[in-house]
Amino acid sequence: MITRYSRPDAAAIWSQETKYKIWFEIEAHAATKMAELGVIPQAAADAIWAKGKDATFDADRIDEIERTTKHDVIAFLTHVAEIVGEEARFLHQGMTSSDVLDTCFAVQLARSSDLLIEGVDRVLAALETRAKEHKYTPTVGRSHGIHAEPVTFGLKLAGYHAEFQRAKRRLITAKEEIATCAISGAVGTFANVDPAVEAYVAEQMGLQVEPVSTQVIPRDRHAAFFAALGVVASSIERLAVEIRHLQRTEVLEAEEFFDKGQKGSSAMPHKRNPILTENLTGLARLVRSAVTPAMENVALWHERDISHSSVERGIGPDATIHLDFALQRLAGVIERLNVYPENMQKNLDRLGGLVHSQRVMLALTQAGVSREAAYAAVQENAMKVWRGEGAFLDFLKADDRVTLPHDQLEALFDLGYHTKNVDVVFRRVFGEG
């Protein structure tokens, strides 16, 4: 986890303090149910809660113990015993370290999911506001990076809004799949712990019961979770790259906000660089880097091994914290994005009407010209424009193969033709015109 790219709320989920608090809650809730089942004395369960619920667990002391035990959960339980006293012997009855570690990991990922969903909601709100603001702002659509046909800037943003709606659904599904609890004991047979304990702990921790845990929660769940994060990161990158392209000097249709006092270059005082969206492109790579290791964690040996552990200690906090940061940064960029409709119009006009070539070709075919002949006539005149020899409309009017009346030809260059169905798309995306 890189502090520079983290928010306090997201980082706090992965702090040692939070982790040990969750570990204690799992152990204490298990003790509560065991007391109800008569496995341990009720007085012991009460004492565990009374002495431990407000305790501050000393990470340095736990690390000190672990240097001897070489086992983090045992080190934690030893430290808890120092706080709770004699009743601590009733903790962890019939449980394994994976019961604690995997359930805690599920809690942390679920809580992180809530922040990520909040981040997507902010992105969605920003996109909706800006899309409606520029619903009819004409701009050029590009394919292969080359001018194609007119669109509206609002329509472009509506497409991203639809994509982030899907991102939200993916995160909700990912949370549902990862939010599972396993308190099943060695090799997952419940031989030494009643299944009712697992059900109770799951309920208290806001999780679902893992149907079959083999001492660990199956890692296909985690693979799906991190894959979902990777897709969301790619959606962030797609919009970030779009903004970066639109900010290029020769395009300049949109631009990141540039605050008073901000500097763009240590050498060139004139620079206004798209540093935030460049940063988002890099963060997306970091988040996606978690996907392959998560996939490789699925194939554990038999009922369990710990080859996944070192991986998850890294990708859990890193991927969630960085994605949380990226979503909030992206929302801020959209909210404050400088949009330049006048430059959009200049770029639309730059090729002298070539963006209307398809409409001219279709009009010719409807007037009785074969598609092949219509394509050839339009393309030949378009190539003259590419070479800077004149205006597209003038060439078309002078071409005997173009049999359309001049007033009809001129009408084909109307931008409104390309925006006539914007309302339809907006209703699909936003549920309104």
What is the predicted role of each segment?
Residues M1-S184, F190, D194-Y200, V209, ...:
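A helix-coil-helix interface module used to build multimeric assemblies
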Residues M1-T18, A55, T68, A75, ...:
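Catalytic-core signal marking the mid-to-C-terminal active-site face
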Residues D102, L109, S113, L157, ...:
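Amphipathic alpha-helical coiled-coil segments and their boundaries
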Residues A30-K33, L116, V120-V123, L127-R130, ...:
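Amphipathic alpha-helices that form helix-helix packing interfaces
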